[in-house]
């Protein structure tokens, strides 16, 4: 099945501590989760690795978020939108359900 949310899409968070924030999808994981730029930041306690010359300390990084907790952001309407699929010229393309505009 084709993914409704893909890498480099702009999404908006629907639920959780980051509700309403927008960001760009950095990575889509096979477990039904995505990593979004600047969203769901967690602090990780990193051990130093002298062999790689990496210092230790507390590092802030993005954690994965469930795909069901985000929606694609429609720049035309300025709101979260649902995604559908259709065939155009023999190719399967994604489109916004609110205004039927093709995505990328």
Curated annotation (Swiss-Prot):
Keyword annotations from UniProtKB, A to Z: Ribonucleoprotein, Ribosomal protein, RNA-binding, rRNA-binding
Example of a GO biological process term: translation
Entry-linked SMART domains: KOW
A GO MF term: structural constituent of ribosome
Keyword Flavoprotein: no
Signal peptide region: none
Record has Nucleotide-binding as a keyword: no
Cellular component, GO annotation: cytosol; ribonucleoprotein complex; ribosome
Protein name: Large ribosomal subunit protein uL24
Species annotation: Enterobacter sp. (strain 638)
């Amino acid at each position: 099945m084709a993914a409704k949310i893909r890498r480099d899409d702009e999404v908006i968070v629907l639920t959780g501590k980051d509700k309403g924030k927008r960001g760009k999808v950095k990575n889509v994981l096979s477990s039904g989760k995505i990593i979004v730029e600047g969203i769901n930041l967690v602090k990780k306690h990193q051990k130093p690795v002298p062999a790689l010359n990496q210092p230790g300390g507390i590092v802030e990084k993005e954690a994965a978020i469930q795909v069901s907790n985000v929606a694609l952001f429609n720049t035309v309407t300025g709101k979260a939108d649902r995604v559908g699929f259709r065939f155009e010229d023999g190719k399967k393309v994604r489109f916004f359900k609110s205004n039927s505009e093709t995505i990328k």
